[in-house]
Amino acid sequence: MAKVELKAPDGPPSDVERIKQESRYLRGTLAETMEDPLSAGIPDDDNRLMKFHGSYLQDDRDVRTERQKQKLEPTYQFMIRVRTPGGVATPEQWLVMDELARKYANGTLKLTTRQAFQLHGVLKWNVKKTMQAINGALMTTLAACGDVNRNVMCNPNPYQSEVHAEVYEWAKLISDHLLPRTRAYYEIWLDDEKVAGTPPVDGEEEPIYGPTYLPRKFKIGIAVPPSNDVDVFSQDIGFIAIVEDGKLAGFNVAIGGGMGMTHGDKTTYPQLAKVIGFCKPDQVVEVAEKIMTVQRDYGNRSSRKHARFKYTIDRLGLEAVKEEIERRLGWRLGEARPYHFEHSGDRYGWVEGVNGTWHFTLFVEGGRVKDYDDYKLMTGLREIAKVHTGDFRLTPNQNLIIANVTSEKKPEIEALIAKYGLTDGRRYTALRRNALACVALPTCGLAMAEAERYLPKLLDKIEEIIDENGLRDEEITIRMTGCPNGCARHVLAEIAFVGKAVGKYNMYLGAAFNGTRLGKLYRENIGEEEILRELRMLLSRYAKERLDGEHFGDFVIRAGIVKEVTDGTNFHD
């Protein structure tokens, strides 16, 4: 195939590119600065590199101003993210994470929207011990953050449960294949001996990434229709499993999704991935690699906010990018096969799997595993992990599946669920069961407003409106993020709130219930009083005027309340 004439955008490299180039494959001076006793933080250059190792330097923003008044440095702490491909963890791994959360972190575990674990509040002096314990449990934090391929997602509880093992295996293979090859991680955290001599020549240590890795983060997810729980179109690469006659026939390939944008900058926008073809299962790892290398070579390394793959595709053209992918593969993708998505939520409660096994999906509000005064969630899960013989699966909706429970073990697990009052969410409204929120304040440095701490309280008030209109069991997706970067995939929710300032949010409406359409800006910079007033009007109209089976996101478009977004490039129109 002839080489397509593509070019990377002009402009000087960003400072992050300099940091990566000079880092000697992610080493920087991390080994030294993490040992420096004079500060609980680390320099900015090393913090940029720290992300590749799976950690962010943060501080407690609740006390930041008071600390400044006292002329004290911020209360620095580290967030550590554990990559768990497909969200699968053993009971032994769960117990390790539980112990680390209580010993070194803030006493809680965060289940993320990318099926990973997060520990918050880890002090600098405890980071290395935490990293070593995580690796001792056969998990890793390498490439959980940074300009690399992140945690690979996959549906943890498909309707065709026999397909899960195969799809999960491919998710793991993709994840392993795209891990950075540098020894820096092992040297710094696991006391591996340093590589002798001078640093290797460019490309030798990173055969896929090269010395400057990717222009920006890169995300991959695998969906198994009819469930779109991974929000496959939000991914840089979305693989849609095609199951024929109960067997995995292959994957449709979608490219160029991404949720992030910048307030006030219309050159930034969310975008949905577009399907470009089909590949067989044994081709999926190669396809993922070749697609990622196109972004490596042609992505924007000058402007970080325009560096995601979605902008590369929109700049070069979908067909040109597809041709370049196929040129690198040396063969053409097949024709995309039919598929259908029904929803993007979880299947709560007990679901029967194959070979006499059962899966229990637990509702975990905000993905936060902790012991509350009246709800010992963390303790209950710890006790279950001690006797569980299957696995745990973190869902893309921040919930948890106690999976592969044998019929013999089920009564014991049921007894512990009952003892600790662990809930499948059925006592809550369908709206709350379909809610997502990012961490935001007080630890995220990018947050402009609350999300995880505020959404449950806002839902208490929205639920009064829901009940007034007889919509308690109506499935509506609602999501909140503290900034427009989109960690909770906000613009794929039928109702979305994006933090603009403390107590103020932009409100979006009209995304598809099954994650196949973006939402549209409806109101800007509004507070709680106006949010509730708008929702009272909207939900009242929906209850009275909806068609049979019509979802809320579809209704607001049909009723002319917001315009339909047909592509990310017209998101701001």
Curated annotation (Swiss-Prot):
Gene Ontology biological process: cysteine biosynthetic process; hydrogen sulfide biosynthetic process; sulfate assimilation
Pathway connected to this protein: Sulfur metabolism; hydrogen sulfide biosynthesis; hydrogen sulfide from sulfite (NADPH route): step 1/1
UniProt keyword list: 4Fe-4S, Amino-acid biosynthesis, Cysteine biosynthesis, Heme, Iron, Iron-sulfur, Metal-binding, NADP, Oxidoreductase
Cofactor(s) the protein requires to work: siroheme; [4Fe-4S] cluster
Ranges where the record places region Disordered: 1-20
Cofactor note: Binds 1 siroheme per subunit. Binds 1 [4Fe-4S] cluster per subunit.
Any one GO molecular function term: sulfite reductase (ferredoxin) activity
Residues engaged in binding siroheme: C487
Gene3D superfamilies xref list: Sulfite Reductase Hemoprotein, domain 1
First-level EC class: oxidoreductase
HAMAP family in the cross-refs: CysI
PANTHER family: SULFITE REDUCTASE [NADPH] SUBUNIT BETA (PTHR11493:SF47), SULFITE REDUCTASE [NADPH] SUBUNIT BETA-RELATED (PTHR11493)
Protein name as catalogued: Sulfite reductase [NADPH] hemoprotein beta-component
